[in-house]
């Protein structure tokens, strides 16, 4: 069996993201995320204290060749919040930076 290196794992309590297995856990329980939700989660975990613009999220997750509506970011953030937040209407993990984008944490 392949062992996963520590660098392949991000821990931001109560979450653990394992890049080798492409799995995200919350309090040890595996979350059922879509490919896009996983990529967004990974981006936030790689940049825990940085506010990210919608465009940065779009370019990283969808790729620079994506020419759709930037609102797709908001839609997927909302879906992700429903899965990871204790209360999606009052998020504590992914916060909105008004007029800018999103940030991990408050």
What are these regions (language model features)?
Residues 1-6, 10:
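Single conserved hydrophobic/aromatic residue that forms the stacking wall/gate
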Residues 11-23:
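Short boundary/linker motifs that mark transitions into or out of structured domains
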Residues 21-23, 28-93, 97-100:
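Positively charged, aromatic-enriched patches within helix-turn-helix-type DNA-binding elements
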Residues 102-105:
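Conserved active-site beta-strand element of glycosyltransferases/polysaccharide synthases
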């Amino acid at each position: 069996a392949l062992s996963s290196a520590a660098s392949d794992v991000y821990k931001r309590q109560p979450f653990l993201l394992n890049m080798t297995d492409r799995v995200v856990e919350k309090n040890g329980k595996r979350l059922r995320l879509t490919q896009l939700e996983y990529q967004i989660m990974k981006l936030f975990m790689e940049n825990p204290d940085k506010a990210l613009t919608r465009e940065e999220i779009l370019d990283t997750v969808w790729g620079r060749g994506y020419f759709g509506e930037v609102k797709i970011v908001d839609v997927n953030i909302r879906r992700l919040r429903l899965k990871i937040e204790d209360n999606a209407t009052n998020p504590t993990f992914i916060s909105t930076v008004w007029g800018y984008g999103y940030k991990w944490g408050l």
